[in-house]
């Protein structure tokens, strides 16, 4: 809305997450100088996960975050993945993962202790589908820089991202 653009234009400087976010702001009338964040820093008291541990867990995908807002999780649970396990970290609410052998709920971890995350890959995903990031939250990944990307990198995990997300490049 134009009121938001007016607020942005009254600032001295804007820090945008990504180039697509910067371009969206410009396309919608922001005249204030914009710099790019590129990626969040992430503090961890732990070292990278040992490479041998990551390689040994090549068939385990980590997803960390607010599981209650992750609308794709029911579809992920229902889809049988042969030889692949998803290690979920975060607040789960009333979701019951116990009847899905490829889903492992690992609880909540302390954010500054990335060494307690176990898996071979980190997943950056949103929306209600497992084949594409759709809906409002999924579409936002076209512009957003999710903090979980920095978490996975701080843990030493390679990441899986949607090909159309702002962080795919």
Label every PLM stretch briefly.
Residues 2-14:
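Membrane-proximal helix-turn-helix segments that form the acceptor-binding/catalytic region
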Residues 6-8, 26-28, 37, 74-80, ...:
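Hydrophobic transmembrane helix bundles of membrane-integrated enzymes that assemble
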Residues 11-34, 46, 165:
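A short, active-site helix/loop in glycosyltransferases that binds the activated sugar's phosphate group
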Residues 15, 35-37, 87, 123, ...:
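Hydrophobic/aromatic beta-strand patches that form the interior of the parallel beta-sheet core
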Residues 18-22, 88-96, 108-110, 128, ...:
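Short, polar loop motifs at secondary-structure junctions
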Residues 28-41, 157:
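P-loop/Walker A phosphate-binding loop and immediately adjacent motor/lid segment at beta-alpha junctions
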Residues 42-118:
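Conserved catalytic-core segment of nucleotide-activated headgroup transferases in glycan assembly
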Residues 114-155, 161-168:
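Nucleotide-sugar-dependent
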């Amino acid at each position: 809305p134009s009121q938001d653009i007016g607020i942005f234009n009254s600032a001295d400087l804007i820090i945008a997450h990504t180039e697509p976010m910067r371009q969206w702001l410009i396309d919608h009338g922001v005249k204030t100088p914009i710099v790019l964040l590129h990626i969040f820093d992430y503090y961890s008291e732990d070292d990278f996960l040992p490479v041998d541990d990551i390689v040994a867990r090549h068939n385990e995908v980590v997803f960390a975050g607010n599981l209650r807002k992750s609308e794709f999780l029911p579809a992920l649970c229902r889809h049988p993945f042969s030889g692949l396990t998803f290690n979920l970290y975060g607040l789960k609410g009333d979701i019951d993962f116990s009847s899905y052998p490829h889903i492992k709920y690992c609880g909540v971890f302390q954010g500054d202790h990335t060494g307690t995350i176990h898996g071979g890959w980190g997943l950056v995903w949103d929306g209600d589908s497992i084949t594409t990031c759709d809906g409002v939250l999924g579409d936002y990944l076209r512009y957003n820089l999710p903090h979980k990307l920095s978490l996975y990198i701080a843990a030493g995990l390679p990441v899986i991202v949607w090909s159309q997300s702002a962080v795919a490049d």
